[in-house]
Amino acid sequence: EGEIVAVMGSSGSGKSTLLNILGLLDGFDSGEYILAGEPMAGLGERAAAKYRSKFLGFVFQSFNLIGFKTAIENVALPLYYQKVSRKERNAIAMEYLKKVGLEDWALYLPNQMSGGQKQRVAIARALVAKPKVILADEPTGALDSKTSREVMTLLREINKEGITIIIVTHEHDIAALCDRTILLTDGLIV
């Protein structure tokens, strides 16, 4: 809890499977998963969605932004599903765009932004619902080394606020910026 952790391993080692289990997107056959003091085994989709919404934020290599929505609309989207009014969700989304240094880009579409800007919008979207844990799947994989360092600096700042961050990465220099690294081989932690 409160750490920034890298998960590394070769292709097929189980990194994505682990992230999907932690994100309550896939079930698991053995072991125990406790989130916020509650066991996660055997959750139905509705209960899993509730836990995801309340405790988890996701950041993906491909950003997963909605192309026809502006930066502020993309960031505000999780709040829409929480039934927050448009005025309030836009104000909150702008607060998070400021946090990631993109307040001037609020009305731009994803195709008008660089990869680093898109990733920062994705991070703001992950943060807007105030998760306890951020799950990041190759968050720097599509970025150049300078932008990767900027994104990692931002993630470290977020981590200092007490948010646990789990990063799947192939990049050793990214893992070196984390508190610890978990190595996976054939689905096992080594």
Protein language model annotation of sequence segments:
Residues 186-190:
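Conserved switch/coupling elements of ABC/ABC-like ATPase nucleotide-binding domains
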Residues 1-184:
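ABC family nucleotide-binding domain
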